[in-house]
């Protein structure tokens, strides 16, 4: 499960600056759900290959009401949701009474907590952070969030328990590296690598289906409708996290695991809207799924929350099916307006199937599974190197790559780089310098050629590194002697 990091601290210590720094490392869309989450912000980030969800909370000021009262709002909930807490303090302002109150609360919680002193740029970090050791939270990590200094090292320290131990790679000498480079270049020119053996059988595993959406769009009704049709007893699988309910079921001789993010089995026990709609629960369910079923209320249209969820789904690379619920009872004119609005606002996800359903009455629900099955099959379909290379060559013939610094980009071969989502890796010369428009052209060409529906497709570009880049030629002893004789001859001529 992808870890969750919460940023807490007094106002104006740089929490939002660090949040933006982290979520922009891969231009992740920030999922912002005002009101429902009490103005907390959620984002997906990656630093040095480590992925995580980060929560930005409002500031906590130690007023006369007490820190505990302020904590009972957004920050306390964020701490409870998080696996890791980054307690941020202002190195320039020094230790404040509110910092001590927050630290006292954090020490009482069984959470991995890291003390982060921000705004250390331009000052001596050792001197500025000395007072914070009295908070009793261990080492103080000095950073400058606005400039990014120390942020990468901080995340590596924080994520250390979640990283698999990696064996260090043996370093090659310059001669070995040069020989390996040219050997690889010759191999690339002469032959296309063979496909590796893959024993993975997607049909042997159940499809993990996450049903997500805003509150009151009909997620629970749809879940009960699906389960009611199959007469499967609902129960909670042990070991599930964040209270998402994992429900095994079988449909058309195919096994599924339904991930119900609504978490509502007995309506009488739900007392707060926040309890019904946990953003973290939803985001982690998306990460854990193979296919995401996004439920939209036809009467409310596409809201900013829907687009935020949609952005997170796309960023996660999960397969997608869209269900427009509460379609029954709408007039033909209203239905036409909804369809026009969907075409306008969802044009960027043209690969996703859209179904118009009524979870309450069951109309259209059965057809959802055809698209779910199609999306899963497309995302896990194995495609050989020869076919991918042939498609790449056809795309190149139809539309030549543009010139880069006066030279034509050369596409050598393509192979599969991963699944769910499908990843195509293209090797060649100067491929990393291709324009964004040509990269989109290649992505759409592969999608059409492979008939991929219901899942995003990603294109990665790789080119061999030139071992001589940035190096100066060194003259041999013989060349040095010739150069010396030439220089002496020129001096005599003067």
Swiss-Prot record:
The Swiss-Prot or TrEMBL record annotates one GO molecular function as: ribosome binding
Q: Does the keyword Nucleotide-binding apply?
A: yes
Q: What does the entry list as the binding residues for GTP 2?
A: 213-220, 260-264, 325-328
Q: Keywords of this protein's UniProt record, alphabetized?
A: GTP-binding, Nucleotide-binding, Repeat, Ribosome biogenesis
Q: Which domain of life is it from?
A: Bacteria
Chain positions recorded as GTP 1 binding sites: 9-16, 56-60, 118-121
NCBIfam families given for it? GTPase_EngA (TIGR03594), small_GTP (TIGR00231)
Tell me which HAMAP family the record gives.
Answer: GTPase_Der (MF_00195)
Any single Pfam family the record assigns to this protein: MMR_HSR1
Give the record's subunit note: Associates with the 50S ribosomal subunit.
Which family would the database say this protein is a member of? Belongs to the TRAFAC class TrmE-Era-EngA-EngB-Septin-like GTPase superfamily. EngA (Der) GTPase family.
Q: Which organism is it from?
A: Yersinia enterocolitica serotype O:8 / biotype 1B (strain NCTC 13174 / 8081)
Residue ranges occupied by any KH-like domain in the UniProt entry: 381-465
InterPro entries noted in UniProt? G_ENGA, GTP-bd, GTPase_Der, KH_dom-like, KH_dom-like_a/b, P-loop_NTPase, Small_GTP-bd
A Gene Ontology biological process noted in the UniProt record is: ribosome biogenesis
Q: What is this protein called?
A: GTPase Der
- Every copy of the EngA-type G domain together lies at 3-166, 207-380
Outline what the protein does. GTPase that plays an essential role in the late steps of ribosome biogenesis.
Q: Which PANTHER family does the annotation name? A: GTPASE DER
């Amino acid at each position: 499960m992808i870890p969750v990091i919460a940023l807490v601290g007094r106002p104006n210590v740089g929490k939002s600056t660090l949040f933006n720094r982290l979520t922009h490392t891969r231009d992740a869309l920030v999922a912002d759900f005002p009101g429902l989450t009490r103005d907390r912000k959620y984002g997906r980030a990656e630093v040095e290959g480590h992925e995580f969800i980060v929560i930005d909370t409002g500031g906590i000021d130690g007023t006369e009401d007490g820190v505990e009262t302020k904590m009972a709002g957004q920050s306390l909930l964020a701490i409870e949701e998080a696996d890791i807490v980054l307690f941020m303090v202002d190195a320039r302002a020094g230790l404040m009474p509110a910092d001590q109150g927050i630290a006292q609360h954090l020490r009482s919680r069984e959470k991995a907590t890291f003390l982060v002193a921000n705004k250390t740029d331009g000052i001596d970090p050792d001197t500025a952070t000395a007072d914070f050791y009295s908070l009793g939270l261990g080492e103080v990590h000095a950073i400058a969030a606005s400039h990014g200094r120390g942020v990468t090292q901080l995340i590596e320290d924080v994520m250390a328990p979640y990283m698999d131990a990696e064996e260090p790679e043996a370093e090659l000498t310059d001669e070995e590296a040069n020989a390996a480079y040219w050997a690889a270049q010759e191999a690339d020119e002469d032959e296309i690598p063979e496909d590796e053996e893959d024993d993975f059988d997607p049909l042997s595993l159940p499809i993990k289906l996450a049903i997500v959406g805003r509150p009151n769009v009909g997620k629970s009704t749809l879940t009960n409708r699906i389960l009611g049709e199959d007469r499967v007893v609902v129960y909670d699988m042990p070991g599930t996290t964040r209270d998402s309910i994992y429900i095994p079921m079988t449909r058309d001789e195919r096994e599924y695991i339904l991930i119900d993010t609504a978490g509502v089995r007995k309506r009488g026990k739900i007392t707060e809207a926040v309890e019904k709609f946990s953003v973290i629960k939803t985001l982690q369910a998306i990460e854990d799924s193979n296919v995401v079923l996004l439920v939209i209320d036809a009467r409310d249209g596409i809201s900013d929350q829907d687009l935020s969820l949609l952005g997170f789904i796309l960023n996660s690379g999960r397969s997608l099916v869209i269900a427009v619920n509460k379609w029954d009872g709408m007039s033909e004119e209203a239905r036409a307006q909804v369809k026009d609005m969907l075409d306008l606002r969802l044009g960027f996800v043209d690969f996703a199937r859209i179904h118009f359903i009524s979870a309450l009455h069951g109309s259209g629900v059965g057809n959802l599974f055809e698209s779910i099955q199609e999306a899963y099959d497309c995302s896990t379909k194995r495609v050989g190197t020869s076919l991918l290379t042939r498609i790449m060559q056809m795309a190149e013939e139809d539309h030549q790559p543009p010139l880069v610094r006066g030279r034509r980009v050369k596409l050598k071969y393509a192979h599969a780089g991963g699944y769910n989502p499908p990843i195509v890796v293209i090797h060649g010369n100067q491929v990393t310098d291709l324009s964004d428009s040509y990269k989109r052209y290649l992505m759409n060409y592969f999608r059409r050629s492979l008939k991929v529906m219901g899942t995003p497709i990603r294109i990665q570009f790789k080119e061999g590194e030139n071992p001589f880049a940035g190096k100066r030629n060194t003259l041999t002893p013989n060349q040095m002697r010739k150069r010396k004789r030439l220089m002496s001859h020129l001096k005599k001529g003067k």
